[in-house]
Amino acid sequence: MPEQLNTRVEDCFQLAESFFKRPFKRPVVSLKLRGQKAGVAHLHENLLRFNPQLYRENTEDFLKQTVAHEVAHLIAHQLFGERIQPHGEEWQLIMRGVYELPPNRCHTYDVKRRSVTRYIYRCPCAESDFPFSAQRHKLVAQGRRYLCRRCRQTLVYSGETRVE
């Protein structure tokens, strides 16, 4: 899996070198990115991080568009310096001119959200539930109190959980 990714990164750099007729410093490539982002270019560290799940699920478009998108950020930074917009004219020039791709800012990959457990708290005055995150539930266990906005009574854990 990473071989194709590294090959595409190298291909993108070679296209840029051919287009601009100058060498560019190669980045470190990592598959340590989670969440909604498909890729991130760390300009000062010369590092590219890619999301392995989105890569697996969208390999063809990922290799074509996402890799070029992130490499274009590094190329733009090496060519034009710090004072450019992330998706500004310089980056767009590279996307269109070098890679002949549309300069899309965001991907359209289907991102699966992980399930989240909510801890149900209740107030003595109302029938309403207050779903707490794991972090907030832990804070309650450590002594933090949360009050009902209506009656100002302390919310109490019901013993119930819900997976969203």
From Swiss-Prot:
SMART domains linked: SprT (SM00731)
Keyword Signal: no
Binding note for cofactor: Binds 1 zinc ion.
Compartment(s) of residence: Cytoplasm
Required cofactor names: Zn(2+)
GO MF entry, a single one: zinc ion binding
Segments forming a coiled coil: none
Gene Ontology biological process terms from the UniProt entry: response to stress
Active-site residues per Swiss-Prot or TrEMBL entry: E70
Keywords: Cytoplasm, Metal-binding, Zinc
Family annotation (InterPro entries): SprT-like_domain, Uncharacterised_SprT
Binding locations of Zn(2+): H69, H73
Keyword Transferase among record annotations: no
GO cellular component, one term: cytoplasm
Highest taxon in the source lineage: Bacteria
Ranges for domain SprT-like: 14-156
Family designation: Belongs to the SprT family.
NCBIfam families (UniProt xref): PRK04860.1 (NF003421)
Designated name of the protein: Protein SprT
Species this chain originates from: Pseudomonas fluorescens (strain ATCC BAA-477 / NRRL B-23932 / Pf-5)
Gene: sprT
